[in-house]
Amino acid sequence: LALAVSHAALPAEMYWRSVFPNTAMPKALRNLLLPAAVNKNMLTDMAKSKDKTVDAFGNYGYSNPSKEFPDGNTPTNNDVYFFESELHPGRKMKLKELAKKVSKATFVPRPVAESIPFSIQKFPEILKYFSLEAKSAEANLLKQTVENCERPAIDGEEKYCAASLESFIDSGVSKFGKNIQLLSNELEKETGNQEFTIGQGVKMMGESEIVCHKMKYAYAVFLCHSIDETAVYTVPLVGADGTRARALAVCHKDTSAWNPKHLAFHILKVKPGTVPICHFLARETLVWVPN
């Protein structure tokens, strides 16, 4: 099943211009517009992947403690989560997320997204729409994303799932108004290198933001959430092969509401609510911040 959607009218771009008439659409968003398609084949590739990072960052382990350490493969280094004091020039880190390839999932137009079932209550309809068996790996992937989108917000969190560019824009404007900017990870070129060194010019962009994690689905779905007392940074990086990048990192100042079995506490050997915990954002994560 691969249902292509005509992009002749460019409705998503027109919506962007209506909201931000004096601002060009960022490249990170333009890349999510073509081809506008629902693609079941992509699900198969995602289901085969053992990568759990996006799921972990989108959920922060707030839900089921039994899922905190998937497949028993718990990272043992501090490069996934780290302390705020480590965010300084010269610090070397292995950033697997920044080096991995982007997914091909793109936004579908808002009318299409709204016509496709998207809830646990309607999960049998979702399976029927994508012609999937209930126990297939692809079905499990869809279910995880829908469950993540429907999980209750924790204390200090506002959350929303966007399945079209229009709803993605709305998620930012509804909280901050139109005087906002969109931040994204920037990589000079594709690289297999995973080791980067933090350069000069680490910049704190504020403590009010909406972090939007790209979830695993047959089209682009972003889990957007704002968590109290969270700072976002832009971090210049240089890879061991010379590749330059600008990455996004967040530091959570208050983790007292997090699940005590969250992976971050296991890696850093600290308890909830004791110290700020930081992590770089996955390559396709987008962040709204006020200007």
Model-derived segments and their meaning:
Residues 1-167:
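Intrinsic-disorder-preferring feature that marks N-terminal prepro/targeting segments
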Residues 116-291:
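Folded, disulfide-stabilized extracellular/luminal domains of secretory-pathway proteins
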